[in-house]
Amino acid sequence: MTGSNMSNALANAVCQRCQARFAPAERIVNSNGELYHEHCFVCAQCFRPFPEGLFYEFEGRKYCEHDFQMLFAPCCGSCGEFIIGRVIKAMNNNWHPGCFRCELCDVELADLGFVKNAGRHLCRPCHNREKAKGLGKYICQRCHLVIDEQPLMFKNDAYHPDHFSCTHCGKELTAEARELKGELYCLPCHDKMGVPICGACRRPIEGRVVNALGKQWHVEHFVCAKCEKPFLGHRHYEKKGLAYCETHYNQLFGDVCYTCSHVIEGDVVSALNKAWCVHCFSCSTCNSRLTLKNKFVEFDMKPVCKRCYEKFPLELKKRLKKLSELAARRAQPKSSGLHPA
């Protein structure tokens, strides 16, 4: 277009907003082929010039950034800021793509997809883990699906057994597979190697072996049946196929002192069908220390030293003597009553 033709075109042109013509020397704003007086090129909402010439167009009308956000831009459900550009609509809310993340592992979900789980938006691996946790099952660390049957444990992680083959024979593995030096073997191949199996975890023992209770154990897995603390070479006590530390063996199976009611550790004084700690066995009247070498008398099912007994009233001593003789006769074996002819 020549200069004269352009001048003629501008002389006939009108402002897009006010529809008035332009003065010959007037500055004109051209926005995508639309012409405006400079003072007419303003926000359709606040009627102010666009800061730095930046505007947003919606349904043929132009808005400054602030008014466009207030009128049309959704707020992000995570950061609360207005969203300009791509909007993720999910969980009855709007999100920036970078703000829509898995609520457990924080991975971005915009391009991965998500699964709704108990009101939460989760990535699929986290959803599978939560689902498995609710069912009391494991998640396979290779395919990230729930393991419905028995898992194969490898390097402390759970897997579907059919993801692996025996290192020696190449057969597909089952949950009975064994790990040895970082490799997996089927049970027959593993047994041929003669490696001891821990009686607790059922896994191979590659280091020190504890032989006890007719089984073999990892050192850290041979523990007290009560407190579950490893013995680590300390003495253990066996009862009905189980091992106990000294403290809990005494608590469960040891003698309890008649006086202090504590489990007796060390020597036991047995008398009057009861048990005492050595330092607790004393006269029930004067509390003087007794031993089995001392003479004592039973009174009210308790020991009384000879000195205190001598102070008892005469009638009481006679009654005690009679009771003692009666108890002695009852303790003697009865004769059959038959006599030879």
Curated annotation (Swiss-Prot):
Q: Which residues form a coiled coil?
A: none
SUPFAM superfamilies, alphabetized: Glucocorticoid receptor-like (DNA-binding domain)
Start and end of every LIM zinc-binding domain?
A: 13-74, 76-133, 138-195, 196-255, 256-315
Instruction: Output the GO biological process annotations, alphabetical, semicolon-separated.
Output: cell-cell adhesion; cell-cell junction organization; positive regulation of integrin-mediated signaling pathway; positive regulation of substrate adhesion-dependent cell spreading
Q: Which Pfam families match?
A: LIM
- InterPro entries tied to this protein: LIMS1/2-like_LIM1, PINCH-1-4-like, PINCH-1/2-like, Znf_LIM
Q: How does it assemble?
A: Interacts with integrin-linked protein kinase 1 (ILK) via the first LIM domain, and in competition with LIMS1. Part of the heterotrimeric IPP complex composed of integrin-linked kinase (ILK), LIMS1 or LIMS2, and PARVA. Interacts with TGFB1I1.
Q: What does this protein do?
A: Adapter protein in a cytoplasmic complex linking beta-integrins to the actin cytoskeleton, bridges the complex to cell surface receptor tyrosine kinases and growth factor receptors.
Protein name, UniProt field = LIM and senescent cell antigen-like-containing domain protein 2
- The organism is Bos taurus
What lineage does the source organism belong to?
Answer: Eukaryota, Metazoa, Chordata, Craniata, Vertebrata
**Corresponding gene?**
LIMS2
